[in-house]
Amino acid sequence: MNINEKTRKALLRFQQNEITESLLYAQLAAIEKDPSNKEVLLQIANDEKGHYTILKKYTGQEISPNKLRITKYYWLARILGITFAIKLMEGSEESA
């Protein structure tokens, strides 16, 4: 597939966001005590990983997650709670 450079850069940004959120949701699931919430978080992590895989088909490139963002939201979840961290994360996603 032939895409222009501007589109490719945007897809790479989205791709990095998807893999970052996949890993983050998996980490949040690891600290979640409620089994049903843990299951939901793992499902979201798998969905995000699927989005990453789809985007990778278009970009043809592996991309590393944003480890700083993962660390930031992980510690926000540990200190202020998972719900707060997820709402904050969703807010930053909508403004992007």
Give residue ranges: language-model regions:
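Non-heme di-metal
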Residues: 1-96
